Amino acid sequence: MEAITTNGITLRRTVAAVQGEDALRAMGERIAGALGPAVTEWAITRGELTLVVQGSDIVYALTYLRDEPACAFRCFIDICGVDYPQRARRFDVVYHLLSLRHNMRVRVKVQTDAATPVPSAIPVFPAANWYERETYDLYGILFSGHPDLRRLLTDYGFEGHPLRKDFPLTGFVEVRYDQDEARVVYEPVKLTQEFRNFDFLSPWEGTDYVLPGDEKTSS
């Protein structure tokens, strides 16, 4: 058991946790050394290794992580997007990989903007196909070299990308089935409701009957 004191708070970590972090640190140093300037930074966060990679080098980095025996990150888990509107390159594209051989996960991040496409990961991991379509649909992030980059979750003709921070919570249109026209119709969002007059001054009258068990408190 190892004890670490931070701001007066003592945290104790098991030997397994310490050894796991040491293995992650060694893996991070190995990958950063092998990929060189392709990796701009790396860190260990919540027991997982996180790499930040240049967008133009993402295919090269993913290929190394998959094929290098010391890494063997061959399980492609997911791709997701993150939106930071205050940044010039507002989007993070995050790749999640798993190595069954080393019982280790790695998170690879690429920064981009709405106009700069990220090279598609399909040549390395074919399963990236639908993940990239989903990321494009929800964030508007472009992927160059994708064979069929079109929306996946939203409807035909949908405007905007719903997981961007500047997308309104209500959306732009509402969808309903019109009984008279016997079809689905799209209309502008309407949040108005009928005027309601709330009476806050009348006292609560309660009930005029006794519920089972209440007779004990009244007596």
Swiss-Prot record:
PROSITE patterns in UniProt: COMPLEX1_30K
Pfam families: Complex1_30kDa (PF00329)
Organism superkingdom: Bacteria
InterPro entries, per database record: NADH_DH_suC, NADH_quin_OxRdtase_su_C/D-like, NADH_UbQ_OxRdtase_30kDa_su, NADH_UbQ_OxRdtase_CS
Main enzyme class: translocase
PANTHER family linked to this entry: NADH DEHYDROGENASE [UBIQUINONE] IRON-SULFUR PROTEIN 3, MITOCHONDRIAL, NADH DEHYDROGENASE UBIQUINONE IRON-SULFUR PROTEIN 3
Protein name, as recorded: NADH-quinone oxidoreductase subunit C
The organism's taxonomic lineage, starting at the top: Bacteria, Pseudomonadati, Pseudomonadota, Alphaproteobacteria, Hyphomicrobiales
Gene name, Swiss-Prot/TrEMBL: nuoC
